[in-house]
Amino acid sequence: DVVEVLERARRQFGIDGLWSHEETGNGWTYQRDKRVGAWARRHGIAWTEIPQFGVTRRMRSRNGWAKRWEAQMAEPITPAPAALQPLEGIDPGVIPEHPCLELSADVCPQRQTGGRSIGLKELSDFLQHRASRYPRAMSSPNTAFTGCSRLSAYLTWGCLSMREVLQTSRNHSGRGVSSFESRLHWHCHFIQKLEDQPAIEFSDFHPFMRGIRVA
């Protein structure tokens, strides 16, 4: 439980502030975040959440969202720190492998390699060589594997930021690049829907569909 982990860290080391990226998840992560927020307030710890994508919290209206998204994406890219001060005395324990968790081996020989340098290489290769095929290739599983950007994992894990991907993309031109940039916009647009309407995880998005699915 994350609150128990944070509390142990607070007692052992002391915590002056809590920093994380701003996440739009599901109902479970939302309840978790509320418990973390309550824990932080109880101990007088400031919790700073850094926006990960072009999603805005607590919007009263969707009017002007696209203009706000463009403004967020146009902001300067924050440079990476030269170094991070390590915290000594933390034992992460043994990271369990699949047999310990009673899971079968996850054999995936063509799994993508993680890391920022590989993510940047994937982005460059897409924009320079594969983007021209993107509008035609994205819809078929036979061609999407090589015709799409393959950046989802790098965006999800924070190896690349949405802002730097879009800004890099706008140094290139062509129909494929424009189509790709539209999908980046849609990515944040649909996450914004979940941010604004978290209940759609548990109910039909369109009210006319209520009752069609049997529980």
Descriptions of predicted regions:
Residues 215:
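Long, charged, mostly alpha-helical binding arms that flank functional sites
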Residues 43-45, 64-212:
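Glycine/tryptophan-enriched, flexible segments
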Residues 1-84, 176:
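Trp/Phe/Arg-rich N-terminal binding region typifying the photolyase-homology
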